């Protein structure tokens, strides 16, 4: 072969190799994630998402063991990807965050959320950004959280005093009495968020019926908000309401609208009469919406009711869920409970009540909160997202309009990150994971999500969790009502509330004068 022929052959080989590499790269960039098996004809994996095969986050976690940290499922006519590794989630919530910050259109958003006016259901856009900014600045900013200190402190003190009164009334010669804590935690959470948002609280007596009504509506709201109905999977079956779920959604939405509408009317009457200055978030909203140019089709009343309603429902349920799981875990691990009480006795003592200025010194208590949020994130699957652009994530191509499900429960039990991931061991946050935070910067631990759609009330929620847990552990000796471990069964839904009651034996451990 002469020189020119050799050069031509080499150039041809290089060209062919280049074309092959370009084709290979193009093919790899359009490679879809592996598809999970077990799909039903027509329905796809709807049986898993709807909870018919068990808790959805657990079932999806089992599929991740087979298919890896990113895999595809079908929900009727919709394609979805499920992710559960910190590397993939970081890529989604940083590089691709804007593209994955929208929500799919589901019946809960239409019927329960004022036709997607509620922040949690509205898609990423101008309206969402305006409402998010208002909520972040006027309710959950560091300045506002500090200004609301008295609400947290007074409601926590009332909660402790009510527990002491229950002990006094029921003790009947015994040093310990049994109380059911799920309901009490729900009342506490509701009163705190109601006071902040609408300036209201329920204290029993004449308020008892309205309190029960409010809690029932909020519970029903969260239960229904987590349901996938048939027409979510098959939009062309929107006329078919199998199981009556849409009818229940509409009825609950009417009750929610009536409740929040009554509070809004009270605030308007107060505003017109000139009574007092703006004190709660609803007052602030009434002031802010005057002359504001919200780029949306909603009227002012709808915006106020939708925003306040979602804050009350979300703040009540998610905070109570974490209180319940934290106490249940402590009762099943009494050595951890005793260690936390020893820390309180050392740094605070028993001659005064713990206060917020003490919390930074209670590092073991903070570790307990982190470990609770790791094992039982209040929304184990977060909220379903919808991609508004094609994305390349984890080596896979994910097309526009795909639904995204982030399995926080599985993420937080990754054995590559957490030793003995299913064990409750707060000490892990005093050792190797000491610097790991829960505020969306460490993608191995994101119980409040991350990126643009991180929970705006994260700082407030953590402050409340620490104060209530510290106050409860300082004020009472706590134990199980029997030798059997606390039942840790979860309920399926938007939040994973404990499926069974939480009965606890309590006895005071402070001087009686501190319970007044």
Swiss-Prot record:
Annotated positions binding heme: 455
Superkingdom as given in the UniProt entry: Eukaryota
EC number: 1.14.14.-
Keywords: Heme, Iron, Membrane, Metal-binding, Monooxygenase, Oxidoreductase, Transmembrane, Transmembrane helix
Enzyme class: oxidoreductase
Membrane topology: Single-pass membrane protein
GO CC terms in record: membrane
Listed GO MF terms: heme binding; iron ion binding; monooxygenase activity; oxidoreductase activity, acting on paired donors, with incorporation or reduction of molecular oxygen
A Pfam entry, by short name: p450
Record field: transmembrane: 3-23
Entry keyword Oxidoreductase: yes
Subcellular location(s) of the protein: Membrane
InterPro entries linked: Cyt_P450 (IPR001128), Cyt_P450_CS (IPR017972), Cyt_P450_E_grp-I (IPR002401), Cyt_P450_sf (IPR036396), Plant_Cytochrome_P450_Monoox (IPR050651)
Cofactor: heme
Gene3D superfamilies assigned to the protein according to its UniProt record, in alphabetical order: Cytochrome P450 (1.10.630.10)
Catalytic activity: genkwanin + reduced [NADPH--hemoprotein reductase] + O2 = scutellarein 7-methyl ether + oxidized [NADPH--hemoprotein reductase] + H2O; (2S)-sakuranetin + reduced [NADPH--hemoprotein reductase] + O2 = (2S)-7-methylcarthamidin + oxidized [NADPH--hemoprotein reductase] + H2O + H(+); apigenin 4',7-dimethyl ether + reduced [NADPH--hemoprotein reductase] + O2 = ladanein + oxidized [NADPH--hemoprotein reductase] + H2O + H(+); (2S)-naringenin 4',7-dimethyl ether + reduced [NADPH--hemoprotein reductase] + O2 = (2S)-carthamidin-4',7-dimethyl ether + oxidized [NADPH--hemoprotein reductase] + H2O + H(+)
UniProt xrefs under PROSITE patterns: CYTOCHROME_P450
Coiled coil: none
Listed SUPFAM superfamilies: Cytochrome P450
Pathway assignment: Flavonoid metabolism
PANTHER family in the record: CYTOCHROME P450, CYTOCHROME P450 82C3-RELATED
Function summary: 6-OH hydroxylase involved in the biosynthesis of polymethoxylated flavonoids natural products such as pebrellin, aroma compounds which contribute to the flavor of peppermint, and exhibit pharmacological activities such as anti-allergic, anti-oxidant, antibacterial, anti-proliferative, and anti-inflammatory effects. Catalyzes the 6-hydroxylation of 7-O-methylated precursors such as the conversion of genkwanin (GENK) to scutellarein-7-methyl ether (SCU7Me). Can also use apigenin-7,4'-dimethyl ether (AdM), naringenin-7-methyl ether (SAK) and naringenin-7,4'-dimethyl ether (NdM) as substrates.
Similarity section: Belongs to the cytochrome P450 family.
Name listed for the protein in its UniProt record: Flavonoid-6-hydroxylase
Species per Swiss-Prot/TrEMBL record: Mentha piperita (Peppermint)
Top-level taxonomy: Eukaryota, Viridiplantae, Streptophyta, Embryophyta, Tracheophyta
Gene name tied to this protein: F6H
